[in-house]
C-alpha cells in the first residue's frame, strides 16, 4: 500500500482544489489515499512522488512489470479526465503528446506514460522551429472527424468562456476596470472561436509549463485541457511569451505562421489581442506594473 504521507493532500494542494471545485471536494480529498492505493494495485504501479496543480493530483510511479516511469493522475472531476483521455487517444499516432496507458474517467483517473528526460521547457530558451514542429504534429496527427455523439470534448467557445469566467471571478480588488477589460476581451475571443475556417482537436493549455523535452530534444505536450475548434488557439502563448511591443508580437506571429502550414498569421495576431488581458490577469492582480504586463493588458483595446 502506498505511504499515506505521500498520498494525503498537503494543505496548499488542498486549498488549490477547494478554490477550483468548492467545498464539495473535501470528501474527495479525504478519500484520495484509499483511491490511489486501489488504482496503484489495479494498474501495477508504485507511487514514488506527488505533485499537481489546481485540477488534479499527480503521482510519479514505477511500473512493477518493467520498472518504467509512469504517472498516475487523479482529478475530482470525471469530465476533466474524460476530456483528457479522449484527446490523448486522438493524438495516439504522434510521439509529441504524452501517451495514455490506461484510463478510468468515471473515477477521474488516468495512467500516463513517462517522458524522458522530461525537462520542462518553462524557464528555458526555446527555438521557434521546435515549437512549430510541435504545433504541426498536433494539427496533423489529430482526428479527421469532428467529435460524435457521446464525445466528452466540447467546443473551443466553452473553453474560452470557462477561462474568462474564472478570471472574472478572481478579478477582486482590480475593480470595474479589470472586469470591463476582461469582458471586452472575452467577446473578441468568443467571436474568433465562432469564426474559425477550420476545426480540429485543440490542446487548450499549450504553454511552456505543459511542454517537456523528450527523446532527441523533441517537444512533448502534456496536460491538455482539450476542445474542438480553431487550432490556431494553441499558438497564442508562444507568440506572446517574452514579448512586450507590438512590433515584436507581429514579428513572432509572422515567423511562427510561416513555419506551420495552415496557421493563419492574422487570426493568430487577433487571438493574441483577445487573450493578452487574460494572460496578464494574474500579474495585474498581484499589483505588477511592468512593461510586459501593461503591454498585455493593452492588447484588447
Label the predicted regions:
Residues 30-33, 55-57, 66-111, 115-138, ...:
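A conserved alpha-helical element in kinase catalytic cores
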Residues 27-36, 143-203, 214-215, 257:
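An alpha-helical support segment within catalytic cores of ATP-dependent transferases
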Residues 48-64, 100, 187-233:
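Active-site acidic catalytic loop and adjacent metal/ATP-binding pocket
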Residues 20, 251, 279-301:
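ATP/Mg2+ or Mg2+-diphosphate-binding catalytic cores
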Residues 77, 94, 106-125, 140-144, ...:
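A glycine-centered beta->alpha junction motif in the catalytic cores
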Residues 2-48:
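Juxta-kinase regulatory segment immediately upstream of eukaryotic protein kinase catalytic domains
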Residues 213-258, 265:
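Active-site Asp-x-Gly
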Amino acid at each position: 500500500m502506498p505511504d499515506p504521507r505521500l498520498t494525503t493532500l498537503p494543505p496548499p494542494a488542498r486549498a488549490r482544489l477547494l478554490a477550483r471545485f468548492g467545498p464539495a471536494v473535501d470528501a474527495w480529498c479525504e478519500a484520495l489515499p484509499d483511491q490511489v492505493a486501489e488504482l496503484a494495485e489495479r494498474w501495477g504501479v508504485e507511487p514514488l512522488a506527488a505533485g499537481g496543480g489546481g485540477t488534479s493530483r499527480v503521482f510519479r510511479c514505477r511500473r512493477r512489470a518493467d520498472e518504467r516511469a509512469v504517472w498516475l493522475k487523479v482529478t475530482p472531476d470525471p469530465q476533466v479526465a474524460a476530456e483528457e483521455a479522449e484527446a490523448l487517444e486522438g493524438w495516439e499516432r504522434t510521439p509529441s503528446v504524452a501517451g495514455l496507458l490506461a484510463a478510468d474517467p468515471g473515477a477521474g483517473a488516468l495512467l500516463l506514460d513517462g517522458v524522458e528526460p522530461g525537462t520542462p521547457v518553462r524557464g528555458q530558451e526555446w527555438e521557434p522551429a521546435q515549437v512549430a514542429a510541435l504545433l504541426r504534429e498536433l494539427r496533423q496527427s489529430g482526428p479527421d472527424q469532428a467529435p460524435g455523439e457521446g464525445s466528452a470534448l466540447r467546443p473551443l467557445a466553452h473553453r474560452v468562456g470557462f477561462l474568462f469566467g474564472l478570471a472574472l471571478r478572481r478579478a477582486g480588488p482590480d475593480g470595474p476596470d479589470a472586469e470591463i477589460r476582461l469582458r471586452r476581451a472575452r467577446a473578441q475571443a468568443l467571436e474568433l472561436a465562432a469564426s474559425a475556417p477550420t476545426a480540429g482537436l485543440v490542446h487548450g493549455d499549450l504553454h511552456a509549463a505543459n511542454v517537456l523535452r523528450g527523446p532527441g530534444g523533441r517537444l512533448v505536450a502534456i496536460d491538455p485541457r482539450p476542445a474542438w475548434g480553431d487550432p490556431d488557439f494553441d499558438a497564442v502563448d508562444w507568440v506572446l511569451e517574452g514579448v512586450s511591443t507590438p512590433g515584436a508580437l507581429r514579428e513572432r506571429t509572422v515567423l511562427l505562421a510561416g513555419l506551420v502550414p495552415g496557421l493563419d498569421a492574422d487570426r493568430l495576431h487577433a487571438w493574441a489581442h483577445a487573450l493578452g488581458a487574460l494572460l496578464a490577469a494574474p500579474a495585474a492582480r498581484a499589483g505588477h506594473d511592468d512593461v510586459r504586463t501593461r503591454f498585455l493588458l493593452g492588447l484588447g483595446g
